[in-house]
């Protein structure tokens, strides 16, 4: 099973080693979640200013955030499934603020690597349809996040 991952660090502040770690973690999560082989996802690391603009434009929230996901393979109400479209899905985009990652790592007293991994998995689970709008959804999603991160070896310190 292999996920096709395109990772871009627009800030130039995240090491190649750390970007590779994100790729490995997402491959691990995709395998554990049974994601279709050759499914595609993009990860973009941006500044607080950039994610602030994205958050304002697409979510109507005038503040920076840590991670935003844009799922591309959601069937909307009234849409029909395309017969014969067996192409691997394009799951969507995960956008992570490098600045917020650093701030939150410090705030929660754990490593940048752990926080970046947490945010990548959080965004990835959103692409797979998980959410945290209700207490039940939040419990399911956050339990899944913790299980994946712990199994991968990125436990909270």
Swiss-Prot record:
Its cofactor is Zn(2+). Its EC number is 3.1.-.-. It is found in: Cytoplasm. One of its GO terms (cellular component) is cytoplasm. Its main location: cytoplasm. Binds 1 zinc ion. Keywords: Cytoplasm, Endonuclease, Hydrolase, Metal-binding, Nuclease, Ribosome biogenesis, rRNA processing, Zinc. Zn(2+) binds at residues 122, 126, 132. Transmembrane segments: none annotated. Belongs to the endoribonuclease YbeY family. Single strand-specific metallo-endoribonuclease involved in late-stage 70S ribosome quality control and in maturation of the 3' terminus of the 16S rRNA. HAMAP family: Endoribonucl_YbeY (MF_00009). This is Endoribonuclease YbeY. It comes from Bacillus subtilis (strain 168). The gene is ybeY.
């Amino acid at each position: 099973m292999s996920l096709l991952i395109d990772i871009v660090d627009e800030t130039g502040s995240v090491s190649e080693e750390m970007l590779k770690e994100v790729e490995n973690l997402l491959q691990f999560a995709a395998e554990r979640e049974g994601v279709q082989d050759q499914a595609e996802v993009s990860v973009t690391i941006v500044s607080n200013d950039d994610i602030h603009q994205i958050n304002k434009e697409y979510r109507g929230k005038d503040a920076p955030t840590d991670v935003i996901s844009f799922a591309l393979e959601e069937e909307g109400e009234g849409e029909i499934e395309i017969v014969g479209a067996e192409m691997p899905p394009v799951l969507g985009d995960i956008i992570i603020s490098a600045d917020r990652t650093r701030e939150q790592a410090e705030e929660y007293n754990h490593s940048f690597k752990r926080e970046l991994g947490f945010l990548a998995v959080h965004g990835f689970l959103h692409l797979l349809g998980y959410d945290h709008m209700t207490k039940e959804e939040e419990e399911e999603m956050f339990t899944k996040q913790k299980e994946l991160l712990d199994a991968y070896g990125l436990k909270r310190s």
